[in-house]
Amino acid sequence: MTVPFKIPISDLDYCLEQLLDHKPPKILPPETIQQLCHTLKTELLQTPNIISLQSPISVVGDIHGQYHDLLEIFQIGGSPPQTNYLFLGDYVDRGYYSVETISLLLVLKLRYPERVFLIRGNHESRTITTNYGFYTEVLNKYQGSADVWTFITDLFDYLPLGATIDGKIFACHGGLSPSCQQLDQIRAVDRFREIPHDGIMADLVWSDPDVAISDFKLSPRGAGYLFGNDVIDKFCQDNNLVQMIRAHQLCNEGYTSYWKGKCLTVWSAPNYCYRCGNKASVLEILHSNYDSKDPTNGSDGEISSINGEFIGVNTSFESFGDDDDDYNDYRNRFNNSSRLHKQQGVLPGQFFNVFEASKENDEDTLQGKSVNGINFDDELSTSDDTSGSGGNNNKGDFFAAFFQERPKRQQVEYFL
């Protein structure tokens, strides 16, 4: 592969402008997406299967083409580069705006490479996207051409399979594998290919936790496994971990905690498929300063509340200096929160932003749109739109400036 030149920041900001300043968002031309994918593939060639990240960081679960709800995530949790993000996969399929969603994430990854991190889910696959909407959406939006689908699904082969946070938390899309006991086994996998039907790579994106079992059990999904408490206990012990964070499963409240927080599921697509009515969440990890080897056995931070109203929280921030710019944004949002609720037996320094569907999600639902019934004229319109912030001249940080101009939306926060 020929190493492409580095895409200028001004060009990336122009792509952001096209996606953010128009309603509906403008789709990027095929040649632009090809260049984005080509550049990012070259960079990801040097990226290990498991990326090592540090807190503070926000963890995002499945998005599934719900573009406006992705914007809601940035509105609630802060936009890059002020906030670090780890996305756990399943960016496309089922939602109406898979093209726009993955396009925005690719641009953000190139624009803020040390702030935005993407790993692979089970829908980052040629087979799955052919059957669950993304392929058809590309054909509809690009006059019958599948080129954009090819560019993006080729890129999917390069995405990492997991991440560690502070060396203590393991994050992946799905779950654990009976073929893998050590993180080094994941690091040794050849990931630059389509997701196979079985083996470590498949299990990482397909498996699910199950509180009713202790060991492994074949998954009813037809791929991956169900895994129980003994499995995750041993995996964490063998790899000096305290927790696993994953996505992959719809949660009505936006998240699910298993085994006193040893395993968390984060779900970030509200009103999934525009009919489920579920909430969504983003997990913010402020720190992982745990005193005990297994902090899930107790709580280091004590929350006081009466009838759900926040009174005070005994969580130490003194270990982070006031000059720690990376941490200040997280700390300020935490201290300014007014609706925190107690959760039993989970790790300190973590909380969920729980939110409901954006008004654009509601509008799409009322219009009865479907992946195979997109309004082509609206999607491909090139007419000028003055409703956005097209006059913004802050090209130094277009993305952050876009969200500074939007009103803050109310969110519900659950402390962990």
Curated annotation (Swiss-Prot):
MF terms (GO), sorted A to Z: hydrolase activity, hydrolyzing O-glycosyl compounds; metal ion binding; protein serine/threonine phosphatase activity
Catalytic activity: O-phospho-L-seryl-[protein] + H2O = L-seryl-[protein] + phosphate; O-phospho-L-threonyl-[protein] + H2O = L-threonyl-[protein] + phosphate
Location of the active site: 123
PROSITE patterns: GH18_1, SER_THR_PHOSPHATASE
EC numbers for this chain: 3.1.3.16
Organism of this sequence: Candida albicans (strain SC5314 / ATCC MYA-2876)
Keywords (A to Z) from UniProt: Hydrolase, Manganese, Metal-binding
Role: Serine/threonine-protein phosphatase that plays an important role in controlling colony morphology, filament extension and agar invasion. Down-regulates expression of NRG1 and affects the expression of multiple filament-specific transcripts in response to serum and 37 degrees Celsius. Plays a crucial role in virulence in a mouse model of systemic candidiasis.
Family annotation (SMART domains): PP2Ac (SM00156)
Phenotypic effect of disruption: Leads to defect in morphogenesis and reduced virulence.
Keyword Nucleotide-binding: no
Enzyme class: hydrolase
Residues annotated to bind Mn(2+) 2: 90, 122, 173, 248
Residues reported in the UniProt entry to bind Mn(2+) 1: 62, 64, 90
Cofactor binding mode and count: Binds 2 manganese ions per subunit.
Gene Ontology annotations of biological process type: asymmetric protein localization to old mitotic spindle pole body; filamentous growth of a population of unicellular organisms; glycogen metabolic process; negative regulation of mitophagy
Location of region: Disordered: 363-391
Activation and inhibition: Inhibited by okadaic acid, a specific inhibitor of serine/threonine phosphatases of types 1, 2A and 2B.
Name of this protein: Serine/threonine-protein phosphatase PP2A-like PPG1
Family: Belongs to the PPP phosphatase family. PP-2A subfamily.
Cofactor: Mn(2+)
GO cellular component, one term: FAR/SIN/STRIPAK complex
Top-rank taxon: Eukaryota
